[in-house]
């Protein structure tokens, strides 16, 4: 029972209670206790919170903080609840029914809300796009509606192929609708995601939807599956790389204090070495490393310097982790005012324009992987991209003149990057490091 000193949330997977999350308000510490049945047959919240209950308060706190929205979404949540930013327990209690992954955090003895859908109208979305100060995208019906991590304006919604709605009860969000924060960002992410799909990568399904004249990106959640006719949505548990490593969201970049002269050499965040170390916890370590390598190379070729630790995730299963489909793929190279330093260094190089055969060879040597694996993957992907990007452009909805110019520039930059890497990739085999 929760008291003023000890507060408790039940952890539910569907109809099954798998354990409890408790918070000692006096000591300011968390604890997770799994049920005996779940310890026998289930999976942990994350690798750092094992089934034997030995996860530390700090590890549990880091896991929970990574579930929270960022920037304005978090600010609105804090304002609505009247709690401090550091009150992680209160924040999780507020959004715990529909966070990333499969686990719902439910107050003890609480009844689930009635199963229902609250449809959203295009006019309501347009109002929030055009006047976000008066009508924040994150606030609906007087309460925060954003419960997924990230900084981009977005809504997590139930979608049945016809209309979008907020879901309650046994239903939950099945899609994430992302709105433009930067020039042509929706088109950019659509192209990059579909390009990965055409190349045969395991990537989330995306489409462009319209609210009046405004475009938005509709992303199908791979941790959710709607069961038509049964009034329920199945969930699958996932963790991002920060959670899997026991890192806070502040360490999603390898240079966790930024790129300033006095702090750029502090590299305590998610790096490729740390990411690849997680393959040992996967059901198929070899396949996991192959997926990680392809993700790294695809991001180099598409100019996605912002591929950080929260942009690579894993399914949690009783037999180990498994990489999820890719997501949040954007060519940030298209925006001059974006940070163009890599989120994770290739060897010790953060400047993508300074990566050559030497850096790629040292990168593979440092990971303990054969250089030929990089050569074959990079060559195959780069050679297939010209045809693949042509196919993807045909998938776009009608574009205006400015959008068409953006797409043409995207293609030119993409093909130039492919030619650049193809020009020296064979040197990776024999270069001395």
From Swiss-Prot:
<comment type="similarity">
    <text>Belongs to the HipA Ser/Thr kinase family.</text>
</comment>
<dbReference type="GO" id="GO:0106310">
    <property type="term" value="F:protein serine kinase activity"/>
</dbReference>
<feature type="binding site">
    <location>
        <begin position="327"/>
        <end position="328"/>
    </location>
    <ligand>
        <name>ATP</name>
    </ligand>
</feature>
<feature type="binding site">
    <location>
        <begin position="308"/>
        <end position="311"/>
    </location>
    <ligand>
        <name>ATP</name>
    </ligand>
</feature>
<dbReference type="InterPro" id="IPR017508">
    <property type="entry name" value="HipA_N1"/>
</dbReference>
<comment type="function">
    <text>Toxic component of a type II toxin-antitoxin (TA) system; overexpression in wild-type temporarily inhibits cell growth, overexpression in a hipAB deletion leads to acute growth inhibition. The toxic effect of HipA is neutralized by its cognate antitoxin HipB. In the ternary phosphoserine-HipA-HipB-DNA complex the DNA is bent about 125 degrees; all HipA in the crystallized ternary complex is phosphorylated. In E.coli phosphorylation of HipA is thought to release HipB from the HipA-HipB-DNA complex, suggesting the complex functions differently in the 2 bacteria.</text>
</comment>
<dbReference type="Pfam" id="PF13657">
    <property type="entry name" value="Couple_hipA"/>
</dbReference>
<keyword id="KW-0067">ATP-binding</keyword>
<feature type="active site" description="Proton acceptor">
    <location>
        <position position="306"/>
    </location>
</feature>
<keyword id="KW-0723">Serine/threonine-protein kinase</keyword>
<keyword id="KW-1277">Toxin-antitoxin system</keyword>
<comment type="subunit">
    <text>Monomer. Forms a HipA(2)HipB(2)-DNA complex with cognate antitoxin HipB; has higher affinity for the latter when HipB is prebound to DNA and HipA is phosphorylated. Binds DNA in the ternary complex.</text>
</comment>
<keyword id="KW-0808">Transferase</keyword>
<feature type="modified residue" description="Phosphoserine; by autocatalysis">
    <location>
        <position position="147"/>
    </location>
</feature>
<protein>
    <recommendedName>
        <fullName>Serine/threonine-protein kinase toxin HipA</fullName>
        <ecNumber>2.7.11.1</ecNumber>
    </recommendedName>
</protein>
<dbReference type="InterPro" id="IPR012893">
    <property type="entry name" value="HipA-like_C"/>
</dbReference>
<dbReference type="GO" id="GO:0005524">
    <property type="term" value="F:ATP binding"/>
</dbReference>
<keyword id="KW-0678">Repressor</keyword>
<keyword id="KW-0597">Phosphoprotein</keyword>
<dbReference type="GO" id="GO:0005829">
    <property type="term" value="C:cytosol"/>
</dbReference>
<feature type="binding site">
    <location>
        <begin position="151"/>
        <end position="154"/>
    </location>
    <ligand>
        <name>ATP</name>
    </ligand>
</feature>
<dbReference type="Pfam" id="PF07804">
    <property type="entry name" value="HipA_C"/>
</dbReference>
<dbReference type="GO" id="GO:0004674">
    <property type="term" value="F:protein serine/threonine kinase activity"/>
</dbReference>
<feature type="binding site">
    <location>
        <position position="178"/>
    </location>
    <ligand>
        <name>ATP</name>
    </ligand>
</feature>
<feature type="DNA-binding region">
    <location>
        <position position="429"/>
    </location>
</feature>
<dbReference type="InterPro" id="IPR052028">
    <property type="entry name" value="HipA_Ser/Thr_kinase"/>
</dbReference>
<feature type="DNA-binding region">
    <location>
        <begin position="380"/>
        <end position="384"/>
    </location>
</feature>
<keyword id="KW-0418">Kinase</keyword>
<keyword id="KW-0547">Nucleotide-binding</keyword>
<keyword id="KW-0238">DNA-binding</keyword>
<dbReference type="GO" id="GO:0003677">
    <property type="term" value="F:DNA binding"/>
</dbReference>
<feature type="binding site">
    <location>
        <begin position="220"/>
        <end position="222"/>
    </location>
    <ligand>
        <name>ATP</name>
    </ligand>
</feature>
């Amino acid at each position: 029972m929760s008291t003023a000193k000890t507060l408790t949330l039940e952890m539910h997977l569907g109809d099954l209670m798998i354990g409890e999350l408790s918070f000692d308000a006096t000591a300011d510490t968390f604890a997770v206790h799994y049920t005996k049945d779940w310890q026998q047959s289930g999976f942990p919240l994350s690798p750092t919170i094992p089934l034997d209950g030995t996860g530390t308060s700090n590890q549990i706190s880091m896991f929970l903080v990574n579930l929270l929205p960022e920037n304005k979404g978090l600010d609105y949540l804090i304002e609505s609840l009247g709690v401090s930013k550091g009150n992680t327990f209160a924040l999780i209690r507020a959004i715990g029914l529909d966070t990333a992954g499969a686990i719902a955090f439910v107050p003890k003895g609480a009844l689930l809300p009635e199963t229902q859908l609250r449809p959203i109208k295009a006019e309501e979305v347009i109002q929030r796009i055009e006047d976000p100060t008066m009508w924040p995208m994150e606030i609906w019906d007087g309460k925060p509606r954003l419960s997924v991590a990230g900084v981009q304006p977005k809504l997590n919604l139930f979608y049945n192929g016809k209309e979008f709605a907020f879901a309650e009860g046994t239903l939950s969000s099945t899609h994430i609708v992302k709105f433009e924060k930067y020039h042509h960002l929706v088109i950019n992410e659509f192209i990059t995601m579909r390009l990965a799909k055409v190349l045969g990568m395991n990537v989330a399904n995306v489409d462009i939807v319209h609210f009046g004249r405004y475009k938005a990106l509709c992303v199908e959640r791979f941790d959710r599956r709607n069961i038509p006719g049964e009034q329920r949505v199945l969930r699958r548990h996932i963790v991002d790389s920060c959670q899997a490593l026991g890192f806070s969201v502040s360490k999603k970049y390898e240079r966790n204090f930024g790129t300033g002269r006095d702090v750029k050499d502090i590299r305590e965040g998610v790096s490729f070495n740390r990411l690849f170390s997680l393959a040992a916890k996967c059901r198929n370590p070899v396949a996991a490393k192959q997926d990680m390598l392809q993700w790294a190379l695809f991001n180099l070729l598409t100019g996605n310097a912002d591929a950080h630790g929260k942009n690579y995730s894993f399914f949690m299963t009783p037999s180990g982790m498994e990489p999820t489909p890719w997501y949040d793929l954007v060519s940030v190279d298209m925006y001059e005012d974006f940070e163009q330093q890599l989120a994770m260094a290739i060897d010790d190089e953060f400047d993508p324009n300074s990566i050559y055969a030497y850096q790629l060879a040292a990168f593979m040597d440092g990971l303990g992987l054969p250089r030929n694996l990089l050569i074959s993957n990079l060559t195959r992907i780069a050679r297939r991209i010209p045809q693949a990007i042509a196919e993807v452009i045909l998938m776009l909805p009608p574009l205006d003149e400015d959008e068409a110019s953006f797409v043409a520039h995207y293609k030119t930059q993409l093909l130039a990057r492919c030619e650049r890497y193809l020009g020296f990739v064979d040197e990776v085999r024999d270069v001395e490091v």
